[in-house]
Amino acid sequence: TEKEVKVYSGRHYNTDRSVYKKFAEETGIKVRLIEAAGISLIERLKREGKNSQADLILLVDAARITNAAKAGLLQRIESSNLENDVPVGLKDPNKEWYALTRRVRVMVANPKVVDVSKINDYTDLADPSLKGKVCLRNRKSPYNQSLVANQILNKGESETKAWLSGMISNVSQPFFPGDISIVRAVSKRKCGIGIVNHYYVARMLAGINGRRDALYAKRTTVLTPNPAHVNISAGGVAKYATNKNEAIK
């Protein structure tokens, strides 16, 4: 019987597919992939219960993979490779999930619209001088939700609430559906600064999205706060996986 691993993934990147292809070629294990939004995958796993076909769960956002573990959707993983390769703080103490990638929430600015020398932290986006110059994703974005949670942890609820109020009052137009659209808007001077995951800018600069997006990205300046908010994507073995060893591999 042909070996296989069924992957439920909340990641939607062509680079992942190239990894699956290489994995299949090197191991002989066929990868069967189901992609959907992270919340949808968690709900699907709950619904399927013991009848679930999932072996490996890949989710974007630390909160989502933690919630999956708390919901009893994952199982303990015994892997010396993962234990040795993944640093402390980027893995579950109960060994139910391990971070696979990190993503930094950076600010991307147009130096022709805003004075980048005066912007050092996320909190600076609440400054009245940026009125009508800030671009943001809508509040459903897990990246922004986690950023806000991180700010509450570091600066307290009242200070975070004041920051959010000030920043939102500086928003230039309706909220954006994705990070790439924010980089484009900043480049076109539709706004002066926005918050995005660092790799979107890197992908655009590399020309992965085409020459036009590469030009858009080159017109912007990336500002990384210190400390910066770093989120993860992570993987775990499904509670009722029938191909556990293949999933760990």
How should these model regions be labeled?
Residues 1-67:
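Early extracytoplasmic/lumenal segment of secretory-pathway proteins
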Residues 8-11, 74-83, 93-94, 96-98, 109-111, 117, 123-126, 211-229, ...:
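Short beta-strand->loop
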Residues 29, 48-57, 73, 130-132, ...:
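Alpha-to-beta junction loops
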Residues 52-57, 75-107, 123, 133-136:
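A structural signal for short loop-to-beta-strand junctions that line the ligand-binding cleft
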Residues 106-113, 149, 231-244:
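A bilobed periplasmic-binding-protein/Venus flytrap-type ligand-binding module shared by bacterial periplasmic
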Residues 121-129, 234-249:
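Bilobed periplasmic-binding protein/Venus flytrap-like ligand-binding cleft at the lobe interface
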Residues 139, 143, 150-222:
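Ligand-binding pocket segment of bilobal, Venus flytrap-like solute-binding proteins
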